[in-house]
């Protein structure tokens, strides 16, 4: 019955937040096996995991498990709506994590990976519904610690590569402002910032 299947799916997805890593890992593997056998269920399973990922009260371990699972989904042009919703969620979670000062974490890396995977299948991902999160990222790229600014720029770099010319120009202004500030010259490990500069120069 549909009700029983929905309840079972919710139960398995909730196990992604189990404090025992082996249990969370098994839940992720089980969900992937279900999708391997029934690929048409991808939007339904993804929606349940997204609801879990954005649920208040989840710890960072649970959130990382959910994002890691979503990063393994098979995406295509036929799943453009799903891809767009994933991009919007990744951007919102990334912005929230950076604002909370959670830098240099596996979660940020997983979110960047997710954006990279989903954007090619989500041509309309950067619509009006994502404007608030994108504006927040630009705000972070001009304020806070230098590490916060660079992490925000790293995501904006990926969004700008798939956005319009206006977004690209805005990103480049923010990048050059970061490079020109005094803090940039004091960094002992400027690799990420230098990589962003190299990518920007190569694209021009």
Describe these PLM feature segments.
Residues 1-204:
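Extended alpha-solenoid helical-repeat scaffolds
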């Amino acid at each position: 019955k549909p009700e029983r299947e929905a309840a079972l799916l919710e139960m398995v997805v909730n196990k992604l937040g189990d404090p025992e890593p082996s249990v969370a890992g098994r839940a992720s593997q089980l969900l992937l096996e279900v999708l391997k056998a029934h690929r048409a269920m991808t939007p339904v399973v993804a929606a349940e995991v997204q609801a879990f990922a954005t649920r208040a009260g989840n710890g960072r371990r649970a959130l990382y498990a959910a994002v890691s699972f979503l990063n393994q989904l098979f995406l295509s042009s036929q799943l453009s709506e799903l891809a767009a919703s994933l991009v919007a969620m990744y951007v919102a979670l990334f912005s929230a994590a950076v604002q909370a000062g959670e830098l240099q974490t596996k979660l940020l890396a997983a979110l960047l990976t997710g954006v990279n995977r989903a954007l090619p299948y989500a041509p309309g991902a950067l619509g009006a519904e994502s404007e608030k999160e994108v504006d927040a990222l630009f705000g972070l790229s001009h304020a806070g610690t230098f590490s916060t600014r660079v992490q925000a720029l790293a995501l904006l770099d990926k969004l700008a590569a798939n956005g319009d010319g206006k977004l690209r120009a805005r990103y480049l202004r923010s990048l050059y402002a970061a490079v020109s500030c005094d803090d940039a010259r004091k960094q002992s490990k400027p690799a990420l910032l230098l990589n962003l500069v190299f990518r920007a120069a190569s694209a021009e």
